[in-house]
A protein has these predicted regions:
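Short amphipathic alpha-helical segments
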Residues: 108-113, 121-129, 260, 264-267, ...
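C-terminal helix-loop subdomains that flank or include functional centers
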Residues: 303-310, 321-325, 329-527
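Extended, regular secondary-structure scaffolds
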Residues: 131-250
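Short coil/turn segments at secondary-structure boundaries
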Residues: 131-135, 148-150, 280-290, 347-353, ...
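An N-terminal domain-start capping segment
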Residues: 43-64, 182-219, 302-316
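Extended, charged amphipathic alpha-helical segments
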Residues: 220-364
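Short glycine/proline-rich turn/loop motifs
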Residues: 96, 100, 104, 312-317, ...
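Extended, helix-rich architectural segments
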Residues: 1-161, 165-166, 176, 522-525
Length: 527
């Protein structure tokens, strides 16, 4: 079947005819999935086969066989990693509390919520976890995040499930109502005495079920279960979040970053391999001798042949084949890869003279990459919001005496219903720090922005505490400046103040001393 058959439709005969190598490889991959992953569901078989195909290309296995000896330009991996790292930057993301009804959030409320999220995501290794989330989603098009309560360390662990082992069922086919979620862990048969191949965990809103199995069937009602355990779901919801890599309004599952470039990358590699074969053939030239015997002639550097017949002719086969059309076609394929992936050539290291390039021109050049990053910020951001909400809901069940949680709910009893904790992605686009600070200063002077908004834009973490620290520093600097000014004033103007005090202590002569006679008061004048 062709790649266009992965959505559940019949593969195209024309596609198989044009790409027989890809068809053979896909057939072998499909057989592997059928034997080891899915045995009883054709549609899921197509989905999982697609996931495995994307992963093989990401890992550089672009051929059915002999991948080590064949030339392979792994643009699938380069493009996926570039978009992901462009979104994450150095710090991945920070947290920001947003109210559904208002933009005004108490500083103390935001501080408590951010501290809770920083703790649980930090314990889950946020930076590496963030990369794995975008990696799994970028390759397969879908990523499932699970939230587990770790009793020993009192935190909610966020983890990434392998999309190739995740299976979802819905209520009456409604994608908005997940009925159950099942994740499987492949096992090595040699490592266990019972011959188990899979460990399975299945969640519903009411219960959690775990078991081992020896076959690859996914229908839990018909499969033989070993060491089966079942217990009540303490949360009342399935602690798993599904994130689409790219929006797909036609169904539940998302779109992979490799969806549009995989076939082109495959053809490009095959073409470059053929060009390499032509060049390799002419690197060690073949010597042609006519009209003479080659038995006594030694080929090599510094060898001199003499005594050849006059009609003899000796020459090397040269590269006289015109490869310009092939080279131009390879360039067209390379250009198409960049156009369809929205990753400019400059983003992968192509040298560009940017000394006289304006910031606006650079933004236009990198706009496709920024557009892809913005789409992922939307889809993954909404998924992380759901994960943050689950963390708080699990805390209410597993650790209701949590100090910060109690303070948060005391200040905002309806916090979970009226607020969301959003991620603010760092974005790795090169920035002119001086220009950014000048623009921030101008916005503050014009009173069209706040310090908090500017800090969020710059990717600062723990903004409420940072603002308090800045204000405290400003107050301390003001008090220190006041004390310094007072000390300088006393040092420079202390003598003048002393003279004024002495003048004040000198008795003022009355009019009798000045005129030589006493001025009568009102009573004497009346007399």
């Amino acid at each position: 079947m062709g790649v266009n058959g992965y959505a559940g439709y019949t593969g195209s005969t024309h596609w198989n005819q044009d790409s027989r190598q890809l068809g053979e490889g896909t057939t072998a991959l499909r057989s592997f999935v059928l034997q080891n992953i899915v045995q009883d569901n054709t549609w899921e078989l197509d989905r999982i086969t697609k996931y495995y195909l994307y992963w093989k290309f990401y890992e550089g296995l672009h051929y059915k066989d002999f991948n080590d000896g064949l030339l392979s330009f792994n643009y699938v991996r380069a493009f996926i990693d570039k978009v992901n790292m462009f979104l994450l930057g150095d710090e991945a993301f920070t947290f920001h509390v947003q109210n559904y009804y208002s933009t005004q959030i108490s500083k103390e409320t935001e501080k408590l919520a951010e501290e809770i999220m920083m703790y649980h995501w930090g314990k889950s290794n946020k930076l590496q976890l963030s990369y794995e989330i975008l990696q799994m989603g970028g390759i397969t098009g879908d990523v499932w995040l699970g939230v587990d309560w770790i009793e020993e360390e009192k935190y909610c662990r966020v983890s990434v499930f392998d999309s190739r082992q995740c299976f979802v069922t819905f209520e009456n086919g409604d994608f908005n109502k997940v009925e159950s979620f099942m994740v499987r862990q492949p096992l090595d048969r040699k490592s266990n005495e019972n011959g188990y191949t899979l460990f399975v965990q299945k969640w519903t809103n009411d219960k959690v079920e775990t078991w081992y199995q020896k076959d690859a069937a996914i229908n839990s009602d018909n499969v033989t279960k070993y060491d089966q355990k079942e217990y009540e779901n303490p949360y009342g919801f399935i602690p798993v979040v599904h994130i689409k890599n790219k929006p797909n309004s036609s169904g539940y599952y998302g779109k992979s970053d490799a969806n549009d470039i995989l076939k082109i990358n495959k053809v490009y590699n095959e073409l470059m391999q053929q060009l390499k074969a032509v060049i390799d053939y002419h690197v060690t030239p073949t010597t042609v001798i006519t009209g003479a015997s080659a038995k006594s002639l030694k080929k090599g550097l510094g060898q001199i042949w003499s005594g050849l017949p006059a009609e003899a002719n000796v020459f090397n086969l040269g590269l006289d084949v015109d490869l310009s059309a092939t080279v131009n076609y390879a360039k067209d394929l390379k250009t198409a890869l960049h156009e369809l992936s929205d990753v400019p050539e400059n983003a992968l290291g192509k040298i560009q003279a940017i000394s006289n390039t304006s910031a606006a021109a650079l933004q236009i050049t990198y706009h496709p990459l920024m557009q892809q990053a913005n789409i992922k910020a939307m889809t993954y951001g909404e998924g992380i919001v759901k994960v943050n909400s689950m963390i708080l809901r699990i805390l209410k069940v597993k650790d209701p005496e949590n100090k910060r949680l109690k303070q948060l709910l005391k200040q905002e009893p309806d916090f979970l219903e009226e607020n969301m904790i959003k991620p603010v992605f760092a974005f790795g686009f090169p920035k002119d720090r001086t220009d950014e600070l000048n623009r921030a200063q101008m916005e503050l002077n014009m009173k069209i922005s706040s310090r908090r908004e500017i800090m969020e834009r710059m990717g600062k973490q723990n903004i409420p505490e940072l603002l308090e620290e800045i204000d405290e520093d400003a107050i301390e600097q003001g008090l220190l400046q006041a004390r310094i000014s007072q000390a300088l004033h006393e040092m420079m103007g202390g003598s003048d103040e002393g003279d004024e005090e002495e003048e004040d202590e000198t008795p003022i002569p009355d009019e009798e001393d000045i005129d030589g006679e006493e001025t009568p008061d009102n009573g004497e004048n009346e007399e």
